[in-house]
Amino acid sequence: MGAGFLGREVAHQAGAGGWRVIPVVRTERSAEGLRQQFEETVATDATSSSFWAELQGQWSGLVWAMAPSRESVGGDFQTMHREGAVRAAQWARERRVAMVYLSSTSVYEEADGGWVDEGSALAQDERSAAMVYAEMETVRAGGSVLRCAGLYGGERELRDRAEGPERWLNVVHREDAARAVGVALRNQGQTFNVAENFPLRRGVAGGVWAEGSKRTRRSKRVSNAKLRNEGWAPIYRAGVKDSSHR
């Protein structure tokens, strides 16, 4: 459900692994770009109750990949997570289908550079609360959650220029994040952080964000130990070309 920057990579990896993949996207324009590889791509509103009431067939897994974006604001963001993801979780529970909800490490409250794991305190802002609610409903329904760090890879490159205050930045390559979905499908009822082994240091001493900037003020270091214990390891490392760090 959702085939954007990360969801599209999940679909590609699953298809390459021999799975029958049916991406569900919100617009016909998005669907057209996927149908060359996935002929059964569907363009519809997967947040609506009618979609889930009418969805039939035998399914081995469901991935909710309508990931947070800076373009998703207000009611649309809330609908995506508080309604759409929750309906997906309820549907998966009723049909005993393994589910993975793709969330974000932005849900953590830590702001002073400390380490966080899956049990760390969570933020209370509106966007974080919406994702955490969807996470809780997913796990309660028997599904699993992947809290992904900042994504890069392909057409999305990391910025090298120093800006803003000193802080820690947690990232993960799109291909590595997509590989974690298989781990989550095999380990239902769990929450995992998906991040590279080494957070990046960014910003400058005494730096500040420009007035009106929407960039996060939080600084944290995200532990991926739980996911690594299940056999996952990042192949890529930010800033290291053709890297393989296991």
Show where each model-derived region lies.
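Conserved Rossmann-fold NAD(P)-dependent oxidoreductase catalytic core, especially the SDR/UDP-sugar
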Residues: 86-125
